[in-house]
Amino acid sequence: MSIGIIDYGVGNLGSVKRAIELAGGETSLIKNPLDAEKYGSLILPGVGNYTECYNKLKQNNWVEFFKKTFDSNRWPLLGICVGMHLLMDKGYEGASAENPTPGLGLIKGVVTNLSDQGCNKRLPHVGWNSINISSNGEVPSIFTGIHNNTDFYFVHSYGVVVEKASMISASVDYGIDIVASVSNKNIFGTQFHPEKSSKAGLALYKNFINIS
């Protein structure tokens, strides 16, 4: 079945769509959650401010969909950049310390500024950087055939802190170890942008297509 790219008014949707097609997948933009049944899997992109992205997701009824209807056994899901952030329980970008913005709660974790995680390097973290695939003896399915220390393209000042280390599928060194990818059964997230990551990004998208 085709992959639905969630169009809620943010993200470089055209680039993601073209990359999926180059990787051999069929895909369409999807605005209405009621149309999710037409698709075998979903991609949640995201660029910009976490709180603004969450609010737009909510305005377009996707938060309700993920809270009440979504089943990862039915729809494998890939969150990209801020899309990965939205998988968490809450985030502080664009919100106060006393009143964080909620997330979808699909993966136990929180979104914080990298400086609050101990990063002393210049932010945002922009450019190519090699990832460390933390397979625990088994390569996570979206990294099948992708070698450890492969370079991917990053653009971010915020990152996720997850409750369970077992859900970290890859990390990246930027002064500190930053979560580069998460996975929980059929739910995946990448901090980097596969659509901007040349052949490695296409390989990752092809793996997601094969999961779908």
Predicted regions and their residues:
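Extreme N-terminal starter segment of soluble prokaryotic enzymes
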Residues: 1-4
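Short acidic low-complexity segments
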Residues: 27-38
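Short acidic/histidine-rich motifs immediately flanking catalytic phosphotransfer sites
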Residues: 36-46
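Beta-strand-turn-beta hairpins that frame and shape the catalytic cleft
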Residues: 149, 183-187
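Short, surface-exposed beta-strand/loop micro-motifs that present aromatic residues
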Residues: 176-183
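Acyltransferase
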Residues: 190-212
